[in-house]
């Protein structure tokens, strides 16, 4: 089954580019940019990856990205992820980036996105991996900061497919950013928001995503299973849920395999993703393999999860059909 998963054509819809910063690249960029790291070796840095909840992860996550300074740093970061994705048979990815985490350090929005874009173009031509970008607002910053970031994005609108909301959820509900997301919709962006697992007021947040914001997708969203009405709405609207099993194991000490199976049984379009693979030490294949080996998911369930990702991706219908046909042909021949 591992071999079957390894070569299965995949889409990834929930991966934070800053979360793909491998320790080796972190040290390389720190040397280049004269940034002093808290850790002397890669091994020491890996030992520090001792996350037990969302805030403990975010503390290390934001500190680590201080090594990203120049356009070429963002190119290298993105290229390294896309090279790995190609090796794991990811044909298509929608990637988050956190511009406020960089502009707040004095790195220009254009510096960030131009570096990422160069890697996207190279990956399309050299690796056969197609990608789109999702701009994520940091929910623990102000709505005013998010609105300014939205305005900064407009000259690069043709490079961005949608907007999302991530970072520390406590005290930062979706409605805090209702006006920002309304404006983003007017500019033609697709909408998604993180509703992380087991967060305070999570059911209220999911409800706000559905009924106040009107999202096209929900990132994580596992706790929706606690409310049959939310489940029914998500299923009826055909909304994607971008679940991240190995990430969940770090943050809530569970792969949430049983929950993923239940979503599938309820007709909810759950997908599997890596989230921050450099930190959780698991890319797409490792996430799917963990679900199969430890969670007991069947071959049919794995195929359904992978198909769901293409089905809810922000693609035109002809490209979607082409990707789904590749999955179908692979499954039939294996």
Model-derived segments and spans:
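Metal-cofactor-binding active-site regions of metalloenzymes
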Residues: 1-191, 197-204, 208-217, 223-334
């Amino acid at each position: 089954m591992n071999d079957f998963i390894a070569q299965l054509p995949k889409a990834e819809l929930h991966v934070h580019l800053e979360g793909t910063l491998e320790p080796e690249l972190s040290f390389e960029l720190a040397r280049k940019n004269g940034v002093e790291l808290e850790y002397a070796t890669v091994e020491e840095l890996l030992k520090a990856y001792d996350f037990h909840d969302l805030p403990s992860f975010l503390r290390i996550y934001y500190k680590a990205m201080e090594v990203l300074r120049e356009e070429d740093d963002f190119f290298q970061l993105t290229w390294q992820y896309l090279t790995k994705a190609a090796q794991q048979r990811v044909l298509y990815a929608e990637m988050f980036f956190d511009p406020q985490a960089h502009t707040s350090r004095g790195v220009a929005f254009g510096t960030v996105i131009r570096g990422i874009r160069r890697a996207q173009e190279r990956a399309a031509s050299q690796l056969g991996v197609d990608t789109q970008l999702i701009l994520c607002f940091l929910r623990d910053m102000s709505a005013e900061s998010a609105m300014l970031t939205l305005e900064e994005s407009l000259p690069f609108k043709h490079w961005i497919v949608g907007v999302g909301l991530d970072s520390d959820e406590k005290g930062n509900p979706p409605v805090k950013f209702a006006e920002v997301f309304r404006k983003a919709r007017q500019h033609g962006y697709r909408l998604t928001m993180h509703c992380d697992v087991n967060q305070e007021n999570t059911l209220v947040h999911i409800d706000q995503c559905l009924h106040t914001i009107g999202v096209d997708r929900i990132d994580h969203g596992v706790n929706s299973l606690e409310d049959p009405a939310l489940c029914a709405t998500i299923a009826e609207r055909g909304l994607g849920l971008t679940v991240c099993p190995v990430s969940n194991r770090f943050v809530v000490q569970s792969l949430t395999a049983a929950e993923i199976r239940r979503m599938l049984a309820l007709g909810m379009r759950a997908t599997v993703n890596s989230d921050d693979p450099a930190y959780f030490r698991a890319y797409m294949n490792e996430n799917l393999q963990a679900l199969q080996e430890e969670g007991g998911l069947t071959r049919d369930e794995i195929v359904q999860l992978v198909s769901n990702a293409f089905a809810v991706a922000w693609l035109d219908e002809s490209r979607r059909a082409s990707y789904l046909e590749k999955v179908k042909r692979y499954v039939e021949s294996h």
